[in-house]
Structure formats: structure tokens, C-alpha cells
Amino acid sequence: MKILVVGGTRFFGIPMVKKLIADGHEVTLATRGQHTDRFGSSVQRITLDKTDESSVKAALCGKSFDVIIDKVAYSSNDVRSLLKHALCEKYIQMSSCAVYQSEHLNITENEFDQKSIELKWLDRPADYALGKRLAERAALEFMDEKNCVFVRFPVVLGENDYTGRLAFYAQHICGGLPMHIQNINAKTSYIHETQAGEFIAKLVDTDISGAVNGCSDGIVSQRDIIGYIEKKCGKQAIISQSGDNAPYDDVCSDKSYDCTKAKSLGFAFSDISSYLYSLLDNEIKQV
């Protein structure tokens, strides 16, 4: 199949594109061209700026694909600039579990219905969750829902994570730096970059539509992360109101996501314990 990947040269886009290539698809990467990818002659490349509709039009107008995988849908205008000018049979949007407005265990896909919200055409708002909700809603202005997939992941972890969020805990605990944490005991879900990327690639060849959750089995708290680092580096975490805000502190109560729909495709998610602590070991070594 002819597949356009918008974004995808870093983090979990790497295993995603690798899997698409391995499965024999004809892959075109559309990026701003700011980062060198590692795919060589296995892919074609288009340069565009998703936030500039004229750039998107110049790069994609008149082009058609079997599938578009949109990894940079942060607002309704992001989606409009793309789907207004590129044609596809199937649209897979990298959404987020941030679209859900309640926190509890086993959150299901139907707890956020993009059709239920008012569409507003906005550039990328400061409110990340709002932008993601509107991005889902905007897609339905251009595509039938049966031809759309909205992939909802929690925080993605992995060796290629460039955000520095997991490193924050190792750096602060091992370095004796204070952290500000309010919700230390609340547990939540994560997913590893390899499974995140390979799951999206798998969706290309399925008939699934609508929203789909994807996350590792098991949930962990900041206390779990901190306790492991404390034991490994032999230092106690300094928790202080004047400390730096911890990146995973936005979870107020235990929450997880029901992945029955994803698992019905035969995709198996690993347990978070199979990779979290090795990632923490790596972060500790780098301090």
C-alpha cells in the first residue's frame, strides 16, 4: 500500500516506519526536514510545514494515498491543512489518552466521543488535551468515521525518548535536587515506544475504525519510580514545594485504559515491568 507518514522520524515513529517497510509498504515521509531519519532509500520524502497550509498544499495537492498516518495532529487546523489537500482511503490519527476527562481504572474508548463536541478551527492551543479533542473532531469533516482510526496512547516511554521526562527523576534524585510532587501515589498507564510504533503499523492492514486505546499491562505510580531510583543510587528523593515540578504529576487518582479493542486484533501488549526498570537503570547510569 501507498502510505504517507506525517511526522515519524523520531521516537516511536522509528519502529513504526521500520515495521511498515518490513511489511512491504511504499512509505513516504512528510516532515519539516529538520531531523535526519535512518531509513535511507527505503522511503520517499516530502518536506512541508503542517502549521502552514500553503506549504502543505504545495507539497501534497493532488496526491493520493491508501493510508495517511498523521503523527502531528495537535489541533483542528493541523488536520484541516492536511486532509484538505491530500486524499486517502484510510486516515490514522495519533491522538492521545489526554482526550479523556475523567480518571478511573479501565477507561474505555466510548468515554470520549469526538462527535459530541463543538468543532472550533484553532491553531495549536496551550491546552494539549483540547487540541487533541478538536483534532479528532476535525477529521470527521473530511473523512467518514468508518475510514478513520484515532489511536489513543498514554505517555510513551523508550530508549529514543527525547522529552527528558523519565530522566528528570534520575537526575533529581541522584543529584540531590528538590522535586515538587503532589500526587505521588496515583498510578497510571504507559506504553513502550516499540509497541506503540508497531501497533500503529498493524492498524494499516485491519478493518478497525474509530478510537482505540493502546497501553502496557499494569500501572505504576511516581512513588514506584522514585523508590526504585532511591534504592539504586542510595539517595533519598527531596520532595519540596519549592522544587522543580515533576513531569508525571498530572495524575490525581489511579487510572488505566481498557485495551480490549486493540487486543481483539491479536496485538499483545507487554507488562510495564518488562521495560520500565531497565529504562530507569539507563537513566541512572547517565547521571
Language-model regions, residue ranges each:
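N-terminal Rossmann NAD(P)H-binding glycine-rich loop of SDR-like oxidoreductase domains
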Residues: I3-D23
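NAD(P)H-binding glycine-rich loop region in Rossmannoid oxidoreductase-like domains
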Residues: Q34-Q93, V99
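Glycine-rich "substrate-gating" loop/helix at the edge of Rossmann-like oxidoreductase active sites
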Residues: P125, P154-T163, N183-T194
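Alpha-helical substrate-binding/gating segment
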Residues: A170-H180, N185-S216
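Conserved beta-loop-beta element that borders a ligand/cofactor-binding pocket
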Residues: S95, E136-E159
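Active-site "gating" loop of Rossmann-like NAD(P)-dependent oxidoreductase/epimerase domains
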Residues: C97-A126, R137, E141-D144
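C-terminal amphipathic/interface module of NAD(P)-dependent oxidoreductases
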Residues: C252-V287
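Mid/C-terminal beta-alpha module of Rossmann-like enzyme folds, strongest
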Residues: F199-S253
